[in-house]
């Protein structure tokens, strides 16, 4: 029972390492609690402890799913609570798998298990969670370190590299607690090496400025989600963004949020967007507009970002939100959603590789909504893309943890790629992030705001931009695989000796 409580407590604590709280030290302490109960557990017990940890981690950390479904998604309280509980129960399977893998593969000393096997198993299952069934890489532990020295690893090995070092640090802290004086000295020295050594990467300038800084304006309309799609509000909403844009012709680039236009592009092109584009060209300004886009051929709907200005272009969202923008396993699940009276949009995913949008004289890497939480997907436009743009509408989640957690992920994308991130949202967090992942300017949440600041286009490539997630994932998968093979070989050898004649 004590081990179960420790595991659950560790999971409950972990979300406080992330935004909006930012108690980064909680992350290694939380993992250290989990590793402690795994040390003396069987594989099945370790899976149970991992599952309890996951229930605490996601039950607190993604509680905003209920807010989205109940307050803004049209679900009744019981359906929203039930589906949120099912989602948390599913996510908790991944820490459970990490426990099973870590103990199954992790024979040997405390140091071998806490420094090699457990951290590697944790990272592998985090990666799996971010890939399986379209992926949900939320609350990956590396994000908790966006304001610590470990962040310096991100341009080299990405968020998984940061997460792996963090898990190793948790193992070192646990070893310092459990081992004798000699082992404790080794563990503390190792922790110092990790903390000090990782900061040395901050001295390397992986990317460099390309041209002069550019004045940009990010529009935050603060349109309430329950009013956004009302037909009678369409004209008022679009006119508001047009008026805000006209007040900032002194900027080189102006960005509207995701689906800032609550109508299809074709419905507002002539009445609003074409005249605005003509004005933008006269002033030498480019405007990026978030708008749904309809293609009659094939009857397809896209979540799009459209460029108005010198070089018109379109970007169609590639990574759609399951159950929000498309329905997986439609023949089975459509019936369930009908019973629960949950409305669902049905968009088409854009092509994996699309021509980069051009704005303010440079190619950019666009992402819409939660596409920016997938680090690997931000790399498809590098090194050509000079800066990152993310447009989103986190009004779906109200004043919950979600907008702050999402902002933290955008900061990691800037850090990994060595590029500025321009982030325009409906209600927040809207801001400019520099190439080192540091906020330059941030608009207050839940206010109508036009945030103006300077953005520096960048050139060059970080190691992560060249390699992606594969070195970190390959290392961790290799550790788990080698330890598995070694333990099986030792078990087979032991059985063989027992079977030899003459042995008692």
From Swiss-Prot:
The chain crosses the membrane at residues 6-26, 47-67, 83-103, 105-125, 153-173, 186-206, 465-485. One of its GO terms (molecular function) is N-acyltransferase activity. It is a multi-pass membrane protein. GO terms for cellular component: plasma membrane. It comes from the Bacteria. The active site is at 258 (proton acceptor), 317, 369 (nucleophile). PANTHER family: APOLIPOPROTEIN N-ACYLTRANSFERASE (PTHR38686:SF1). This is Apolipoprotein N-acyltransferase. The gene is lnt.
């Amino acid at each position: 029972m004590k081990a179960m409580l420790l595991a659950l407590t560790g999971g409950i604590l972990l979300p406080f390492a992330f935004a909006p709280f930012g108690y980064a030290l909680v992350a290694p302490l939380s993992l250290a609690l989990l590793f402690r109960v795994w040390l003396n557990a069987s594989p099945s017990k370790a899976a149970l402890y991992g599952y309890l940890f996951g229930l605490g981690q996601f039950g607190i950390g993604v509680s905003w799913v209920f807010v989205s479904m109940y307050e803004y998604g049209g679900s009744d309280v019981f359906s929203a609570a039930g589906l949120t509980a099912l989602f948390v129960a599913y996510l908790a399977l991944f820490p459970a798998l990490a426990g099973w893998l870590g103990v199954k593969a992790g024979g040997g000393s405390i140091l071998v298990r806490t420094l090699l096997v457990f951290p590697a198993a944790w990272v592998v299952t985090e990666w799996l969670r971010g890939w399986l069934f379209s992926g949900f890489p939320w609350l990956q532990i590396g994000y908790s370190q966006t304001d610590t020295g470990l962040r310096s690893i991100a341009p080299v090995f990405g968020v998984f590299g940061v997460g792996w070092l963090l898990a190793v640090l948790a193992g070192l802290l646990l070893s310092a607690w459990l081992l004798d004086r000699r082992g404790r000295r080794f563990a503390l020295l190792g922790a110092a090496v990790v903390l000090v050594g990782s900061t040395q990467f901050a001295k390397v300038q992986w990317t460099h400025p390309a041209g002069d800084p550019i004045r940009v304006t990010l529009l935050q309309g603060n349109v309430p989600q329950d009013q956004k799609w009302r037909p009678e509000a369409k004209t008022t909403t679009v006119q508001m963004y047009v008026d805000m844009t006209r007040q900032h012709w002194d900027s080189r680039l102006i960005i509207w949020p995701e689906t800032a236009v609550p109508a299809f592009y074709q419905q507002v092109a002539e009445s609003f967007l074409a005249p605005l584009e003509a004005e933008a060209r006269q002033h030498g300004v480019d405007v990026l507009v978030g708008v749904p886009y309809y293609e009659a051929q094939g009857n397809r709907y896209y979540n799009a970002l459209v460029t108005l200005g010198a070089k018109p272009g379109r970007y169609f969202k590639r990574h759609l939100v399951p159950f929000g923008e498309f329905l997986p396993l439609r023949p089975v699940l459509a019936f369930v959603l009908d019973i629960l009276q949950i409305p669902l949009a049905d968009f088409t995913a854009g092509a994996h590789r699309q021509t980069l949008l051009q704005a303010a004289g440079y190619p950019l890497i666009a992402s819409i909504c939660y596409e920016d939480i997938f680090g690997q997907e931000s790399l498809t436009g590098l090194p050509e893309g000079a800066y990152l743009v993310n447009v989103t509408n986190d009004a779906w989640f109200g004043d919950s943890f979600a907008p702050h957690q999402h902002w933290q992920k955008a900061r990691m994308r800037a850090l990994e790629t060595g590029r500025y991130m321009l982030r325009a949202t409906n209600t927040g967090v809207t801001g400019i992030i520099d190439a080192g992942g540091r906020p330059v300017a941030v608009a207050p949440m839940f206010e109508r705001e036009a945030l103006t600041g300077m953005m520096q286009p960048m050139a060059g490539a970080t190691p992560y931009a060249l390699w992606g997630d594969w070195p970190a994932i390959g290392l961790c998968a290799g550790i788990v695989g080698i330890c598995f093979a070694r333990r099986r070989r030792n078990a087979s050898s032991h059985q063989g000796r027992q079977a030899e004649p003459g042995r008692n």
